[in-house]
């Protein structure tokens, strides 16, 4: 088991900021098209974070042209250039699947205050 843990530790990313469900994040993705590389930004609310070692994932939801788009990102993916936390949200759940049914102002998340 020590060999497996050692390999997992070597493959983990340490440059990812701490974020949780309800936060608004910008995920900078490295896209390879032929020989060219470019960075594409996916900004939205984190609706789920699955912790773990190398298999950790997080789900980001955004509204694009009136259509909800969700994308699941592996946290240790080499295609993720960086993750920025834009705002921190105050929520009482760890899984925000109820946002799928809400539209407009009802789908807003309150900002987390400093108390």
UniProtKB/Swiss-Prot annotation:
InterPro entries: Ribosomal_bL19, Ribosomal_bL19_CS, Ribosomal_bL19_sf, Translation_prot_SH3-like_sf
Keyword Ribonucleoprotein in annotation: yes
Alphabetized UniProt keyword annotations: Ribonucleoprotein, Ribosomal protein
GO biological process: translation
Matches recorded under PROSITE patterns: RIBOSOMAL_L19
One Pfam family, short name: Ribosomal_L19
Family: Belongs to the bacterial ribosomal protein bL19 family.
Role according to the record: This protein is located at the 30S-50S ribosomal subunit interface and may play a role in the structure and function of the aminoacyl-tRNA binding site.
Keyword Nucleus: no
GO molecular function, one term: structural constituent of ribosome
Organism: Desulfovibrio desulfuricans (strain ATCC 27774 / DSM 6949 / MB)
Record GO cellular component, one term: cytosolic large ribosomal subunit
Protein name in UniProt: Large ribosomal subunit protein bL19
């Amino acid at each position: 088991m020590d060999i497996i843990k050692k390999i997992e530790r070597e493959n983990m990313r340490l440059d990812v900021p701490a974020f949780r469900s309800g936060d608004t994040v910008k995920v900078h993705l490295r896209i390879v098209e032929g020989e060219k590389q470019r960075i594409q930004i996916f900004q939205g609310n984190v609706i789920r974070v699955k912790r773990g070692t190398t298999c950790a994932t997080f789900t980001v939801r955004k509204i694009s042209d009136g259509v909800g788009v969700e994308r699941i990102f592996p946290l240790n993916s080499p295609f993720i250039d960086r993750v920025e936390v834009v705002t921190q949200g105050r929520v009482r759940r760890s899984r925000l699947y109820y946002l799928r049914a809400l539209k407009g102002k009802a789908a807003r998340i309150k900002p987390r205050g400093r108390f």
